[in-house]
Every structure is written in C-alpha cells, then in structure tokens.
C-alpha cells in the first residue's frame, strides 16, 4: 500500500511518483461529468458519507489482512522498476510493510497516528503521520465517522464540499471539492458499494502538481471487499502501481508485529 506520509525518509513510499515526473506544467484537467444519483440518499456533507460507509459494512469488514505486494515505479528512463513488499494490517490504524528480503529488517510501520521507518530492524524516531489510503480504504469501516472525519480534516480535506460525478462508468460521491474542481484534495466513493475508489491530492514535493491515486479491480471477500491493484497517475500517465497476491483475511497476527521495538523478534506471518 502506498505510504504517502513518510515522504522524505523512504523514497519509494510515495515520493517515487515525483522521480517519475518531468517538469512540464500540469495540463488542464478534463471536465468531470456531473450525474444524477441513482440512490435515494443525497449526501450533503463528507461526514455523512463516512458514516454511511461505516454503517454499510459494520461488523462485516475484516480486521486483519496480509498480502504480498509487487510494487512498480516508472523511472526517469521510462523503464519500470519492481520491488516486493510484504504487508500486514490490523484494522484500524496498524500497517506493517516489510521490504524484500524480510530478513534484512527494513520497512515501515504505521501505528495509529505515528509512522516509523525501520532500518536493519531498528526503528528511527517516529513522525506524526496519517496514511489517508489506510484511513479511507480500511479504517473507515471500523472507526467512528467522527474519528475518520477528524483525521481527514487534518490531511486538508474540506468535508463540507460534496458533489456527484462518474468514474469508469460508475456513479461517485466526491468529497473535498465542488464540481469541476480537481485541484483540491478530494476522495471519491462508489455510490452503490460505498467503497473508496480515488484520491486526488497535491504531489508530496510540489503542491502545484497533482497525483491521482486509484483503488481498482475490487473483488469481494466474504461480505467485504478488497482492491488488489492500486495505481498512481500523474499528468495523465501511470507512474506507479501495486498488485497484491496471496491475499488472506482474518489472519491471526502477533501483536508484536506492530511494536517498533520488536521488529525482528515478532512472529512474522511470512515465516513458518
């Protein structure tokens, strides 16, 4: 899972997008089609949307998840560079990413509102950090709407701005911007399924440019869902993507996996 908030410490965690982009000016965004909503519900505020997401899957969304991730970044030479990451989630608020090889002890750990970069099994000092993809793609289905809303406001989303649009043939609720505005931080939610689909935000190192992050190819897992492919687009070009395999939910995970002081000693889900 892309980790956009550890931007300076780990280049591949979101800042990799910047390396793939050239200095051309941001093109004018294409007009967004405004649609009539087929649902009887008309949301007028972002917190209403978050509450509906929580209510739809209350008691149905998995609380643990593991997967192997192929991470592909487009280099300045226009060639794709691939890495393998191993990820474990305890929802809400905990995400562990091990970089291949796991034995090297390198990775990133999110624990609630803090993030740790791990090098050689040792945690660097934490930074206050929120991962909006973790919040919107997973935590929202376990947290209260008030808690999720507070986190997103900290990240610069204006929850008072809501409109409806379409994306890839499906109706969407857009929170954070008015119709036609693609320059404000905003997230898109599928009207029918109430699943997070898209996030548009300024790039980490240049706030005048945008990146478009997409959760794609959703598939059902029991009564919940998972997106096994995440894409990042910049200036109309795919520059980064993640593909998940060996996906498992309801996994028994050692609590120590999410303790930065026990990175190497925790019982790892990848090891027998």
PLM segments and residue spans:
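Bacterial N-terminal signal peptides that target proteins for export
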Residues: 1-10
């Amino acid at each position: 899972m892309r980790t956009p908030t550890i931007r300076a410490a780990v280049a591949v965690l979101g800042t990799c997008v910047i390396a793939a982009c050239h200095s051309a000016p941001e093109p004018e965004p294409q007009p967004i089609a405004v649609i009539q909503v087929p649902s009887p519900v008309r949301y007028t505020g972002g917190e209403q949307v978050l509450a509906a997401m929580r209510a739809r899957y209350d008691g149905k969304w998995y609380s643990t998840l593991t997967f192997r991730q192929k991470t592909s970044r487009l280099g300045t030479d226009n060639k794709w560079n691939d890495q393998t990451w191993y990820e474990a989630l305890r929802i809400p608020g905990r995400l562990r990413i091990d970089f291949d090889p796991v034995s090297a002890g390198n990775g990133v750990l999110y624990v609630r509102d803090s993030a740790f970069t791990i090098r050689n099994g040792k945690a660097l000092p934490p930074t206050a950090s929120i991962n909006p993809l973790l919040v919107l793609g997973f935590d929202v289905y376990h947290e209260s709407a008030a808690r999720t809303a507070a986190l997103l406001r900290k990240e610069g989303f204006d929850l008072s701005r809501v409109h409806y649009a379409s994306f890839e043939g499906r109706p969407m609720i857009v929170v954070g911007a008015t119709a036609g505005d693609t320059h404000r931080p905003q997230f898109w939610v599928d009207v029918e399924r109430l699943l997070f689909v898209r996030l548009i935000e300024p790039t980490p190192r240049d706030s005048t440019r945008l990146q478009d992050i997409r959760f794609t190819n959703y598939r059902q897992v029991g009564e919940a869902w998972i997106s096994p492919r995440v894409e990042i687009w910049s200036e109309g070009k795919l520059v980064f993507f993640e593909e998940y395999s060996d996906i498992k939910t309801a996994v028994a995970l050692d609590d120590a996996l999410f303790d930065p002081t026990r990175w190497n000693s925790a019982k790892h889900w990848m090891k027998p």
